[in-house]
Design a protein with these regions (language model features):
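N-terminal helix-turn-helix DNA-binding module of bacterial transcription factors
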Residues: 1-46
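Conserved hydrophobic residues forming the short capping helix/wall of the S-adenosyl-L-methionine
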Residues: 31, 79, 194, 248, ...
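Alpha-helical recognition/docking segments in bacterial nutrient-uptake
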Residues: 47-161, 165, 223-225, 239, ...
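Hinge/beta->alpha junction and helix N-cap segments in small-molecule ligand-binding domains
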Residues: 59-70, 88-96, 147-158, 174-221, ...
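Flexible loop/turn connectors
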Residues: 221-324
Length: 324
């Protein structure tokens, strides 16, 4: 295969130049074997669409991927309403291994990058390479990059304050066994707020499992087996809370009669609203975060601005049947 033919195939003009499917497959196989990555910057310079910004959106491929759809939906709405004509490239990555995927997009020259739910290790690596493009972190703090985030201390205090107002002096905690950065910060903020407000959170009543409905179901079963556990329960995710509610139903634990649940709300609000009983949450403002991320990225890209800028959005307390 000639160099010219390879170039035509790489640049997506094989059909136009009537190059056979067999030849296209041979070139594709060679590219896979060599680990070849097309130079997107050069391609865009040759393209008639070189003025159209391309934004990379990185998100970890674990249980949190269910949250990605929510952010994408709100970002897409904001793109349409703002008229920002950009291309969004989605790249999932393994937690703590952003470097494995990140090197490629940094070399290929995207117009900007949105990084969601990165670990402390991933953030440290990213700050060490100083990419020359606008970078926005979701729900993280950084001096190097722009951020759009909620205040984890505010979230913890909001939950603890409402629990104390109802007269509770002790609370159980249902939490993820994996110490994901923002989640663990919110739990710690809740515990610290409880200490200040006179609410006991005994270690033996901090029950952990996977951050899924099944994990919550198993935690709910553990709680049901305890002798006289706290009636008040704080859950670090609505996935865990919904699973626990199923276990409570099977164990004959009435909510809110025998136990009350308040959770961090990360999923689609309808998931909590239409469950029986409906779930009370400190709702993370995914819609506002998505809107602010896109607005900030648009401003940075159009002004060729890589300086850091920080936007705070506020969580909301949504009281329903499980705790009011």
């Amino acid at each position: 295969v000639s160099v010219t033919t390879v170039s035509i195939i790489i640049n997506g003009k094989a059909e136009e130049r009537k190059i056979s499917a067999a030849t296209q497959e041979r070139v594709a196989e060679a590219m896979r074997d060599l680990g070849y990555q097309p130079n997107l910057s050069a391609r865009r310079l040759r393209s008639q669409e070189n003025e159209r910004p391309v934004i990379a959106f990185f998100w970890p491929l674990d249980y949190r991927v269910s949250i990605l759809a929510s952010f994408l939906n709100f970002i897409q709405i904001e793109i349409a309403e703002s008229g920002f004509d950009c291309e969004m490239m989605i790249q999932t990555y393994e937690n703590d291994k952003l470097e494995q995927y990140g090197t490629t997009f940094l070399k290929n020259g995207y117009s900007g990058a949105i990084i969601g739910a990165c670990s402390a290790k991933d953030q440290q690596w990213l700050e060490g390479i100083c990419p020359r493009m606008p970078v926005i972190l979701i729900n993280r703090e950084s001096e190097h990059f722009s951020t759009v985030c909620t205040d984890n201390d505010e979230v913890g205090l909001m939950a603890a304050t409402k629990i104390r107002q109802k007269g509770y002096t002790e609370a159980a905690i249902f939490a993820s066994r994996h110490s994901y950065f923002a989640t663990s910060q919110r739990v710690q903020a809740f515990i610290s707020s409880c200490e200040r407000l006179g609410i006991e959170t005994d270690e033996k009543y901090i029950l952990k499992g996977s951050s899924t409905r099944n994990g919550g179901y198993e935690i709910g079963k553990q709680y049901a087996a305890l002798k006289e556990p706290p009636k008040m329960i704080f859950c670090d995710s609505d996935a865990i809370a919904l699973g626990a509610l199923r276990a409570f139903h099977e164990e004959g634990i009435s909510v809110p009669g025998d136990a009350e649940l308040l959770s961090i709300g990360m999923l689609d609000p309808e998931a909590a609203s239409y469950y029986v009983p409906s779930l009370s949450v400190v709702e993370m403002p995914n819609k506002e975060i998505g809107q602010q991320v896109l607005r900030l990225m648009r401003k940075k890209v159009l002004n060729n601005d890589i300086s850091s800028e920080h936007v705070k959005v506020h969580a909301k307390l949504m009281l329903r049947e499980s705790f009011s």
